[in-house]
Amino acid sequence: MTDEQVLAEFRAAEALLEGHFILSSGLRSSRYLQCARVLMNPARAARLAEALAFKIPDKLKIQLGSVVSPAMGGVIAGHEMGRALGLDAMFVERPDGVFHLRRGFRLEPGQKVLLMEDVVTTGLSSREAIKAVEEAGGQVIAAAALVDRSNGTADLGVPFYPLIRLDVPTYQPESLPPELAAIPAVKPGSRAAVAA
């Protein structure tokens, strides 16, 4: 799947938004990818996951024992990646502000895991999820995401395979360009709201 085909899937789902957005990282952006909209169609979600699975090297795929994703945004993407790879898919969640495996999910000691995200901006949620997998006894050997919007700066500590890289400028709240500052900010993501 080419980058243009991936973007066409987002456009068809009305998931590529323009405006002033507060990202889960706290950074601001003029564009937002609402992955929940692109993933709400099971056939589209499967196509995107299968295209991403194709990008992961076979030498890594054969080592994997499961897929783990962070709730909330990564749950559907992780489930579809599990289907594409023929692996169980689990998720970590933050009942107390810190990611944990719950709901009876467990990893065998040393089990090799693919961390699956919907979007990576700073990599903070991914690193927190990797820590939770390690604390549960697993070993994340690679990460994947539908979209890398980090401008190449996210360091997850493991090989990272995005379906598409979108270089959309992000800004600190105190360093907004005037045209963005003039638009009221909205927070469409899944992490708790940050002070504006």
UniProtKB/Swiss-Prot annotation:
Its cofactor is Mg(2+). Its EC number is 2.4.2.10. GO terms for biological process: 'de novo' UMP biosynthetic process; pyrimidine nucleobase biosynthetic process. It catalyses: orotidine 5'-phosphate + diphosphate = orotate + 5-phospho-alpha-D-ribose 1-diphosphate. PROSITE patterns: PUR_PYR_PR_TRANSFER (PS00103). The keyword rRNA-binding does not apply. Catalyzes the transfer of a ribosyl phosphate group from 5-phosphoribose 1-diphosphate to orotate, leading to the formation of orotidine monophosphate (OMP). Pathway: Pyrimidine metabolism; UMP biosynthesis via de novo pathway; UMP from orotate: step 1/2. PANTHER family: OROTATE PHOSPHORIBOSYLTRANSFERASE, URIDINE 5'-MONOPHOSPHATE SYNTHASE. Orotate binds at residues 121, 149. Homodimer. 5-phospho-alpha-D-ribose 1-diphosphate binds at residues 117-125. This is Orotate phosphoribosyltransferase.
